[in-house]
Amino acid sequence: MGGDAIVLYPYPGLGHLISMVELGKLLLTHHPSFSITILASTAPTTIAATAKLVASSNDQLTNYIKAVSADNPAINFHHLPTISSLPEHIEKLNLPFEYARLQIPNILQVLQTLKSSLKALILDMFCDALFDVTKDLNIPTFYFYTSAGRSLAVLLNIPTFHRTTNSLSDFGDVPISISGMPPIPVSAMPKLLFDRSTNFYKSFLSTSTHMAKSNGIILNTFDLLEERALKALRAGLCLPNQPTPPIFTVGPLISGKSGDNDEHESLKWLNNQPKDSVVFLCFGSMGVFSIKQLEAMALGLEKSGQRFLWVVRNPPIEELPVEEPSLEEILPKGFVERTKDRGLVVRKWAPQVEVLSHDSVGGFVTHCGWNSVLEAVCNGVPMVAWPLYAEQKLGRVFLVEEMKVAVGVKESETGFVSADELEKRVRELMDSESGDEIRGRVSEFSNGGVKAKEEGGSSVASLAKLAQLWKQK
């Protein structure tokens, strides 16, 4: 395998892997002299409560890698050994960070074989455990941040918050001010950042510190989409009193459509719906709702009168009436029958990229995961923002108040969204003047995303700077 070697190490989650693969493909398209190696791994299934979900995710990872390898033989996947057993002391929440730590000996072997041609290692943020090791070995180390630029602005401020407050709760009712961002309510910050005694928090603190010391941060975004946040990052306003590493925006990176999905029932159904008429509801691989919440969602959709395509996952395992319940067992009685002329409910999965690119889809109820947001923006689909976990509440603030490409649901203190609330937001998006304005803004960003990846576009230029940096080493 010749050429200057670039090694990419993604976290073993499908969304993280897809973004890394798309980065590798982009590099080879514009700079084919590089040799791309992706370190592929699967997550351990030793935690009983999540074993089934993780095993299913691992199967998806394996199938995805096979498909990519067949279509892109220039990308080399190096399969790391599966970590079959975990130390008992590992904090469950910190598992994503710890898993990378356990892989260090295996990764060092790979890096050693590429030593003479290795130009850079690109880490997922959850793979931060490699940073100190690679710096000691003088390997140029970059981070590929799979979330938004505005989320990075928050992440880089964590050491400052840690130094100047005892807890994020110290802000009280005063919104948090971060350069390049609208005012952030404390309630929108990820809950896991409030407890500083956990290893998870300590890992986040370490990651944000290391990112600031890295050779550069690569972002799956484009300049027009996050203009204010990116200007603040590049101006060093998010890292006071120390230099900011170079910021490279190379997006939007989203996976292409697969002809293998053309026969999926959701696409066949969409073929028979009017243009821009369908609301698509999908909440990612971890988007699990209680039966009570599913029932409220169903009633809200029914009352809205809108056409819908809804991906429904099973409720939490402790709520399951049987291992694989029917829709009738988890949705209101008669709902599927009453709405069959304008709605389709599919179980567990639908080909999201293909669905969002379909002419019939006119709205997207999303958990605000960044990959999903980019897919919607690139296809000109406006959103209803319904965050569930991690940094997604920050995403809602950004999508609704900064970008103005979404309407946001309002949940109770326990996170419950009523049927009336969902009905109201779906109607607002699909059938109002404000919804039309949102649709227009998304269309502008969609066009901007296309231009960013054309020759002379901002993302192609940013990628060229990155490649030049590696070639000079």
Curated annotation (Swiss-Prot):
Function text: Sequentially catalyzes two glycosylation steps at the 5-OH and 3-OH positions of anthocyanidin. Unglycosylated anthocyanidin or anthocyanidin 5-O-glucoside, but not anthocyanidin 3-O-glucoside, can be used as glucosyl acceptor.
Additional comment: In roses, anthocyanidin 3,5-O-diglucoside is the first stable anthocyanin, and therefore responsible for flower coloration, whereas this is usually anthocyanidin 3-O-glucoside in other plants.
Molecular function per GO: UDP-glucosyltransferase activity
SUPFAM superfamilies assigned: UDP-Glycosyltransferase/glycogen phosphorylase (SSF53756)
Family (UniProt): Belongs to the UDP-glycosyltransferase family.
Highest taxon listed in the record's lineage: Eukaryota
One Pfam family cited in the UniProt record for this chain: UDPGT
Record InterPro entries: UDP-glycosyltransf_plant, UDP_glucos_trans, UDP_glycos_trans_CS
Keywords: Glycosyltransferase, Transferase
PANTHER family: GLYCOSYLTRANSFERASE
Keyword Glycosyltransferase among UniProt keywords: yes
UniProt EC number: 2.4.1.-
Biological-process GO terms, alphabetical: anthocyanin-containing compound biosynthetic process
Protein name (record): Anthocyanidin 5,3-O-glucosyltransferase
Pathway stated in the Swiss-Prot or TrEMBL entry: Pigment biosynthesis; anthocyanin biosynthesis
